[in-house]
Amino acid sequence: MHAENSFVIDDWYPVGALAETVSGRKYHTRILGTEIWYQLADGTVSAGLADNTAELASKSIYGLLWVSLSDNPRDVIAIPEFAEADRRVVSAGSIRVATSGLRVIENFLDMAHFPFVHTDILGAEPLTEVAAYDVEIDEAADEIRAVNCRFPQPKGSAAASEPVEMQYVYRIARPFIAILYKTCVIDANRLDVLGLFVQPVDQESSIAHTIMCYLDDINTDKQLRDFQQRIFGQDIMILINQVPKALPLNPRHETPVRADALSSAYRRWLNDRNVTFGTTRG
């Protein structure tokens, strides 16, 4: 049994996009309610507690700067696609959201809202049904995957020129990290990778760092960024109006609907790992 919140304390958290970080400038932010600083200088990341009583582990990978509060953090998750030379790694920005980071992740996993929130982009009426998909627990990696996900989308990516039934694989790698592998319209034999890396600022606020790892020789970085920011911008009003802001982990709050199978698995997974930060059990 995990000690309360050890599963989140012993992890790494993004604090900024590498492309948007000014070298030599000292930044101040919070992780899990703890005030910290970080800096990029001569290609090296450094970080510490805001009161300068301790240095913190830090690194740069996947287009982000990362910091851990732990003296012995586990490894950063592996995303092999980032090492593929023909992929574009583009930041879609770091957006502050006035809700628990776990809420941000759960919203990312939800396909049911596509036709109603992302109308004529990720979905459209009357095609509103979420087809059955499979949820798998990878015991060795301690991750959740949803496979065989599919949804008809009018414009499933910035590169899409016509409607297509997008194929999705969701990977919940850590409580505050979810990776989406989706149909690549440029290369049918490979998948685009969209990473949502959430920085839990405190119990009820977070910063969503989104990184695209795409096979796209059509769009500029700005066009890729604009497309993804439009999608996230449509989600903001939903996220900030959710009550409570913390993610409910009491089983009575779960809705046993097929479309919510991944969300239910995510909540149980958090509960089983004694994650209480950013949650409520009321």
Swiss-Prot record:
Broadest EC class assigned to this enzyme: oxidoreductase
Catalyzed chemical reaction(s): 7-methylxanthine + NADPH + O2 + H(+) = xanthine + formaldehyde + NADP(+) + H2O; 7-methylxanthine + NADH + O2 + H(+) = xanthine + formaldehyde + NAD(+) + H2O
Xref: SUPFAM superfamilies: Bet v1-like
Function of the protein: Involved in the caffeine degradation, which is the essential first step for assimilating the carbon and nitrogen in caffeine. Probably catalyzes the N7-demethylation of 7-methylxanthine to produce xanthine and formaldehyde.
Enzyme Commission number: 1.14.13.128
Keywords in alphabetical order: Alkaloid metabolism, NAD, Oxidoreductase
GO BP term (any one): alkaloid catabolic process
A Pfam match: VanA_C
InterPro entries cross-referenced by the UniProt entry: Cholesterol_7-desaturase, VanA_C_cat
This protein's name: Probable methylxanthine N7-demethylase NdmC
PANTHER family hit by this protein: 3-KETOSTEROID-9-ALPHA-MONOOXYGENASE, OXYGENASE COMPONENT (PTHR21266:SF60), IRON-SULFUR DOMAIN CONTAINING PROTEIN (PTHR21266)
Molecular function as annotated in GO: oxidoreductase activity
Claim: rRNA-binding is one of the keywords in the record: no
